[in-house]
């Protein structure tokens, strides 16, 4: 059940960000990290990319939730947390590559 609910929430969040992307950098809505908020171009890409990853991760987690049913609650919770961490890591890696291709790290981090 955890995987189904968590996966569903990830899918909904991803769809909402895809349909209604935050237009400008803000501290309320969107993919907010130091790197993504350092530049409008990075902000736009972070929200676009992470929304796609959230939808994909949500589908995988929801599928696992359907397969596992209410069994293995801890495993479903671990998979949900892993999906969030992987989404964060892949998005930050993409932003870092974009930043370095522009000739420097604008966030002040290496």
Swiss-Prot record:
Its main location: membrane. The chain crosses the membrane at residues 4-26, 46-68, 72-91. It holds the Pfam family SdpI. One of its GO terms (cellular component) is plasma membrane. It is a multi-pass membrane protein. Keywords: Cell membrane, Membrane, Transmembrane, Transmembrane helix. The keyword Cytoplasm does not apply. It is found in: Cell membrane. It comes from the Bacteria. This is Uncharacterized protein YfhL. It comes from Bacillus subtilis (strain 168). The lineage of its organism: Bacteria, Bacillati, Bacillota, Bacilli, Bacillales.
């Amino acid at each position: 059940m955890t995987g189904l609910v968590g996966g569903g929430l990830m899918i909904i969040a991803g769809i909402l960000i895809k349909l209604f992307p935050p237009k400008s950098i803000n501290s309320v809505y969107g993919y907010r990290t130091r790197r993504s908020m350092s530049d409008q171009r990075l902000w736009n890409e972070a929200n676009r990319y992470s929304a796609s990853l959230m939808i994909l991760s949500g589908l995988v987690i929801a599928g696992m939730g359907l397969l596992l049913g209410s069994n293995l609650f801890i495993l479903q919770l671990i998979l949900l947390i892993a999906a969030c961490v992987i989404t964060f890591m892949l998005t930050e890696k993409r932003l870092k590559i974009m930043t370095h291709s522009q000739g420097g790290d604008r966030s002040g981090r290496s």
